[in-house]
């Protein structure tokens, strides 16, 4: 039987709060490189990443998937979805992965972090559309409409290991907008869709392999559609994001994915399509202002370094 001295417990945690708030913790700037295995739990030290990209993957209608099914069937659906997502994160060298119920999130930092994160996100939605859901629907009749929803965001992050020392009850805690905004983006996506914040779009929009349709037809910049991420606060430039409904092309997908990971940005078959689309987008006062806000915020970040 569990016995708890409630007064002593509350006094203990209250004392911890008082100690924590009595002075500011130390923040160590780690630039773009971080080894999470070295994070302390007792020392009042937070490590700062100058930029990290968060990718969140959620399973639509997950709470309904277990209705009228055996427990083993529900477990199989969760394993198929989440297991596939985690494997994809691993293949794209995610620096940190956490599983959360019906989904998972990953953080990418360091060299080619945006390339790895965006390619991982597109691969997850491709897996959802072309592999996961067709197999689920083939096996179970009357399955609720489901599939993976993906969101991306980026920002500087603070991290510290938090929990109970010398027990398994401890995890890294990530403070910053990246994970929160990626989760909000994923919430607004539908199944097989990827929603990215404005900051992520600023990077994607400069890459022909990502911003323009493939060579199966005439290259077209209408691959991504405008979206306002409603749960991101008004006045934050990241609120004006983009939605991707397409998946990797069976013909050109492997080539384009490899090109992005190699750091390539330009295609010979793309001339003015991408830049013309960006110029048209900037005619919108709302999106133009959001882009300028993001540019100003980036300048402030760089000035603090």
From Swiss-Prot:
Signal peptide: none annotated. It is an enzyme of class 4 (lyase). This is Uridylate cyclase. Mn(2+) 1 binds at residues 58, 102. Pycsar (pyrimidine cyclase system for antiphage resistance) provides immunity against bacteriophage. The pyrimidine cyclase (PycC) synthesizes cyclic nucleotides in response to infection; these serve as specific second messenger signals. The signals activate the adjacent effector, leading to bacterial cell death and abortive phage infection. A clade D Pycsar system. The pyrimidine cyclase gene of a two-gene Pycsar system, generates cyclic UMP (cUMP) from UTP as well as cGMP from GTP to a lesser extent, has little to no activity on ATP or CTP. Expression of this and adjacent effector MePycTM (AC A0A1C5G2D0) probably confers resistance to bacteriophage. The genes are probably only expressed in response to bacteriophage infection. GO terms for cellular component: cytoplasm. It catalyses: GTP = 3',5'-cyclic GMP + diphosphate; UTP = 3',5'-cyclic UMP + diphosphate. The keyword Thylakoid does not apply. GO terms for biological process: defense response to virus. SUPFAM superfamilies: Nucleotide cyclase. Its cofactor is Mn(2+). Its EC number is 4.6.1.2, 4.6.1.26. It comes from Micromonospora echinofusca. It is found in: Cytoplasm. Belongs to the adenylyl cyclase class-4/guanylyl cyclase family. Pyrimidine cyclase subfamily. One of its GO terms (molecular function) is lyase activity. Mn(2+) 2 binds at residues 58, 102. Homodimer. The keyword Iron-sulfur does not apply. Keywords: Antiviral defense, Cytoplasm, Lyase, Manganese, Metal-binding, Nucleotide-binding.
């Amino acid at each position: 039987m569990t016995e708890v001295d409630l007064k002593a417990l509350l006094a203990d945690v209250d004392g911890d709060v008082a100690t924590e708030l009595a002075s500011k913790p130390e923040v160590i700037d780690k630039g773009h490189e971080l080894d999470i295995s070295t994070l302390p739990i007792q020392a009042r030290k937070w490590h700062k990443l100058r930029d990290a990209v968060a990718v969140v993957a959620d399973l639509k209608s997950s709470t309904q998937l277990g209705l009228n099914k055996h427990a083993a069937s529900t477990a199989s659906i969760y394993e198929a979805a989440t297991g596939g997502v985690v494997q994809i994160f691993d293949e794209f060298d995610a620096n940190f992965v956490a599983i959360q119920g019906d989904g998972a999130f990953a953080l990418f930092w360091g060299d080619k972090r945006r390339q790895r994160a965006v390619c991982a996100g597109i691969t997850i939605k491709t897996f959802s559309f072309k592999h996961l859901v067709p197999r689920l629907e083939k096996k179970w009749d009357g399955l609720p409409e489901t599939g993976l929803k993906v969101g991306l965001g980026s920002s500087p992050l603070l991290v510290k290991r938090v929990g109970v020392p010398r027990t398994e009850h401890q995890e890294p805690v990530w403070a910053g907008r990246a994970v929160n905004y990626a989760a909000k983006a994923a919430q607004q996506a539908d199944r097989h869709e990827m929603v990215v914040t404005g900051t992520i779009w600023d990077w994607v929009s400069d890459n022909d392999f990502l911003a323009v349709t493939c060579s199966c037809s005439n290259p077209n910049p209408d691959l991504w559609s405008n979206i306002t991420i409603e749960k991101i606060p008004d006045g934050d430039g990241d609120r004006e994001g983009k939605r991707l409904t397409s998946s990797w092309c069976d013909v050109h997908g492997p080539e384009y994915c490899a090109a992005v990971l190699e750091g390539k940005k330009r295609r010979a078959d793309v001339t003015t399509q991408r830049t013309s689309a960006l110029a048209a987008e900037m005619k919108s006062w709302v999106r133009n202002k959001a882009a300028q806000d993001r540019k100003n915020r980036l300048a402030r970040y760089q000035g603090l370094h």
